[in-house]
């Protein structure tokens, strides 16, 4: 084997060299594009009971926070704005009581008025309960959805939180954290 056989240049060598040089050129000239900034974290809302009218302004358009009611509890689903934000899959639920819509799996079933959920079947209520089980472990609990302002509870300076298995009633009635307003 002489030295000239080591320096033979074939078509395969040419293709390989072009590919390697192409990658090298790309690596040298690529622009360093910064990663997109993570979405800004909004401060948790203070705990507060709301009427349907008050809840409506938290639809992701009028306010950056996205809230909706489910089984009488208000959840801050802002971190799920890819699902619940304006124009998204469940965007029609934002700012409303979503119990009937999630129970019936019909997004058009949201109401702009107080809904006492009469007419929901046991199966539909069970479906709504399953949604709530997921929400209370994933999203911040803001308070309760009440029919009128006289039913609101005072939570002091408490911020909304992920409550998990903790009952909202135990928070309202427990210790000095929450007392019923006298209006």
Swiss-Prot record:
It is a single-pass membrane protein. Gene3D superfamilies: Cytochrome b5-like heme/steroid binding domain. GO terms for biological process: innate immune response; nervous system development. Keywords: Cell projection, Membrane, Neurogenesis, Transmembrane, Transmembrane helix. Residues 47-146 form the Cytochrome b5 heme-binding domain. The chain crosses the membrane at residues 9-29. Disruption phenotype: Axon guidance defects of nerve ring-associated interneurons that extend their axons posteriorly into the right ventral nerve cord as well as defects in the axon guidance of D-type motor neurons that project their axons longitudinally along the ventral nerve cord. No axon guidance defects are observed for the AVG midline neuron. Expressed in the AVG pioneer midline neuron and in several nerve ring neurons that extend projecting axons into the right ventral nerve cord. It is found in: Membrane; Cell projection, Axon. GO terms for cellular component: axon; endomembrane system; membrane. The keyword Transmembrane helix applies. It comes from the Eukaryota. Transmembrane protein required for the axon guidance of a subset of ventral nerve cord-associated interneurons and motor neurons. May function with the netrin receptor unc-40 in axon guidance. The cytochrome b5 heme-binding domain lacks the conserved iron-binding His residues at positions 84 and 106. Interacts with unc-40 (via cytoplasmic domain). This is Protein vem-1. The gene is vem-1.
């Amino acid at each position: 084997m002489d030295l000239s056989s080591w320096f033979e240049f074939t078509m395969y060598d040419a293709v390989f060299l072009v590919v390697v040089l192409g990658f090298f050129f790309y690596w040298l000239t690529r622009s360093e594009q910064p990663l997109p900034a993570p979405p800004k974290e909004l401060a948790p809302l203070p705990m507060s009971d709301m009427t349907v009218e008050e809840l409506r302004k938290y639809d992701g358009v009028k306010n950056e926070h996205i809230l909706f009611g489910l089984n009488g509890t208000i959840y801050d689903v802002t971190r799920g704005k890819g699902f619940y934000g304006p124009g998204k899959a469940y965007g029609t639920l934002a700012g409303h009581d979503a119990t009937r819509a999630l129970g019936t799996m019909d997004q058009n079933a949201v109401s702009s008025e107080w809904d006492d959920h009469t007419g929901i079947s046991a199966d539909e209520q069970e479906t709504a309960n399953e949604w709530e089980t997921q929400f209370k472990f994933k999203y911040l609990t803001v308070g309760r959805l009440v029919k009128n302002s006289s039913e609101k509870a005072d939570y002091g300076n408490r911020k909304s939180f992920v409550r998990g298995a903790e009952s909202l009633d135990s928070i309202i009635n427990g210790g000095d954290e929450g007392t019923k307003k006298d209006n």
